[in-house]
Amino acid sequence: SANPTGPLHVGHGRGAAVGSSLANLMLAAGYDVTREYLINDAGNQMHNLALSVNARYLELFGKEVSFPENGYHGEDIIVTARRIKEKYGDKFLHMEETERLSAFQTLAKDEKLAALREDLEAFNCKFDVWFSEQSLHDAGKIKEAVDTLQKKDYVYEKGGALWFRSTKFGDDKDRVVIRDNGVSTYFAADIAYHQNKFQRGFDRIINLWG
């Protein structure tokens, strides 16, 4: 998977090519294979995408804005803002910022995801399922996964946060699943995603990281 916040880079392409080749080999060997793309469409990176597009959009109307500290500085963000202006004009200028950011996050995500699909198809890398990380949050699957771990005593509280006992499984340190502000981590979402995979009937999962 790659975050739908910008173009694919070489590392993404390498992972996609390796995964696609593995899937093709296993299909040729007679295995039942599902090629799934996890869309990382939740969390801070998506919020930073919305903030970045918001800044570029406002600049197009002559507004003086400070660019977000952790924003995306690529030319593609400017292009996205221009397309939004061309299609919607000044519609979003008159919205509350929260509403405008929500709209920009959706519009930018859809555009970036379409570009990712196009790039992947260009070198014949196909996916059967496009799975949204946000859908796990919306369905309460993150909490469900953490609750499951707590019942098995794999999670403990320290410093107001919830920690997964990953050292029991060979990790060099335990990992936070719920921060002290109550917000789940990407690690918690990954756990929920894998639990969801097994709930959907998969018995073997090959992950391509990076």
Please report, for each region that a protein language model flagged, where it lies by residue:
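NTP-dependent nucleotidyl-transfer catalytic core
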Residues: 1-210
